[in-house]
Structures are given as structure tokens and as C-alpha cells.
Amino acid sequence: MNASNPCRRFPRSARVRTRAQYTVVFDTARRTSDPLLSLHWRSGETPPRLGMAVSRKVDTRAVGRNRIKRVLRDAMRHLLPELAGGDYVIVARSAAAKATNPQIRDAFVRLLRRAGALPLPAAPGTMPPARAPRPSSLSPTEPDPRSD
């Protein structure tokens, strides 16, 4: 669980749960892939929901499959406030079984950004956007004392 709030769980309202919901996403959604994960998403006005498919082809041991799901749920829980609405279904690939937790999390964030569900991070070293000019204390009829 989360270290700052250990009781906080991934809410049921933020999950794709039924076979019908998965079918709708797979039939009508767009898809983008990474070597570790594949993301199927369907934009919408609804709050963001996550579904996961981690088959026995990925890892024959339940412990390995559950680790992948746990990492994805935790990443989603932290990203939920800034995530665009819609349904997101993650399909794990066999390479995810050998990946570390940070690698899985980074692949998930990368796919969400590629899908446009998360804002792109600002490039390092870039200047912030220019602010609107403040109104001058001088009126337009008074000459500027600095111009002399």
C-alpha cells in the first residue's frame, strides 16, 4: 500500500470489471504498445478506469502475475488525479515478468503519455511560459522618464 496513507485502496469505481466492459474496450479502443505492456484505451467523459490482463503466458507463477498487477495498480492510484477520463486496459507481455518494478511503472507512464492520457513533462532546462505584461504605472500621455 501507499506509505503516506496505508489504508488507501484502489477503488472499485476506478476499475474495468466485467467481461462486457472489457469487450467494449477491446472492440472500440485504440492501442499502443511497448516491449513490456500494451495499452488499449477508450476516451470518454467518465472518470478514468483501469483494467488489467496478465495471463499465464506472461508468468506461470501467480506470484509473478500478482506483482505486475500490484505495480500497475499502485502507479494508477498515484496518476488518477491527473489522468484523462476513459477506460484503460493494460495487457502485460512476457517480458514484463523479468522487468523490475520501476521498469514496469515507467513503461505504463510512457504508454499513457503516448495515448495522450497524461500531460507531457516539461523538457529539462526550458524556460517557463512568458507571463502577461503587468500594467504600467505610467499613463500613455506622460513621457517615459527613461527615454531622455
From Swiss-Prot:
GO terms for molecular function: 3'-tRNA processing endoribonuclease activity; ribonuclease P activity; tRNA binding. It catalyses: Endonucleolytic cleavage of RNA, removing 5'-extranucleotides from tRNA precursor. Keywords: Endonuclease, Hydrolase, Nuclease, RNA-binding, tRNA processing. One of its GO terms (cellular component) is ribonuclease P complex. Its EC number is 3.1.26.5. Residues 119-148 are annotated as: Disordered. It comes from the Bacteria. InterPro entries: Ribosomal_Su5_D2-typ_SF, Ribsml_uS5_D2-typ_fold_subgr, RNase_P, RNase_P_CS. GO terms for biological process: tRNA 3'-end processing; tRNA 5'-leader removal. It is an enzyme of class 3 (hydrolase). RNaseP catalyzes the removal of the 5'-leader sequence from pre-tRNA to produce the mature 5'-terminus. It can also cleave other RNA substrates such as 4.5S RNA. The protein component plays an auxiliary but essential role in vivo by binding to the 5'-leader sequence and broadening the substrate specificity of the ribozyme. Belongs to the RnpA family. Consists of a catalytic RNA component (M1 or rnpB) and a protein subunit. This is Ribonuclease P protein component. It comes from Xanthomonas campestris pv. campestris (strain ATCC 33913 / DSM 3586 / NCPPB 528 / LMG 568 / P 25).
